[in-house]
Amino acid sequence: MARFLIVEARFYDHLNDMLVAGARAALEAEGHEAEVLTVPGALEVPGAIAMAAENGEFDGFVAIGVVIRGETYHFEIVAGESARGILALTMDGIAIGNGILTTENEEQALERADPARKDKGGEAAKAAIALLKLQDRFGA
């Protein structure tokens, strides 16, 4: 059994609830424990994971959030930089599943967040589990 921290950027409550539920269900189905930490936005997710990874309390992480395109360039910055930050941490050997949705509209986000549909929260948790298994295999 491993301990996972689900780090959520809580902005769209109803969508986050679904993503977290999917992630938690996927982790618990494999016998893992999950705790949830909320941060203000998607740009804060990588930093929160980096801080939490420092103490070794958690074996893996699931990043959760929803970024919906608006009328400004802000979408590109938030979507790209949050993904870049998560990827950088993953390249440093931290097991992270990225479940931060980047969509054109709320309808697309709902389709992806709903555990009964595309279940991207569950998929992100499964990715984190897979990376944790790779850590074990390669002794990372």
Swiss-Prot record:
Top-rank EC class of the record's enzyme: transferase
A GO term from the CC aspect: riboflavin synthase complex
Keyword annotations from UniProtKB, A to Z: Riboflavin biosynthesis, Transferase
InterPro entries membership: LS, LS/RS, LS/RS_sf
GO annotation terms (biological process): riboflavin biosynthetic process
Residue positions binding (2S)-2-hydroxy-3-oxobutyl phosphate: 71-72, 112
Positions annotated to bind 5-amino-6-(D-ribitylamino)uracil: 11, 42-44, 66-68, 98
Pfam families in alphabetical order: DMRL_synthase
UniProt EC number: 2.5.1.78
Protein's job: Catalyzes the formation of 6,7-dimethyl-8-ribityllumazine by condensation of 5-amino-6-(D-ribitylamino)uracil with 3,4-dihydroxy-2-butanone 4-phosphate. This is the penultimate step in the biosynthesis of riboflavin.
Family to which this protein belongs: Belongs to the DMRL synthase family.
Protein name as catalogued: 6,7-dimethyl-8-ribityllumazine synthase
Gene: ribH
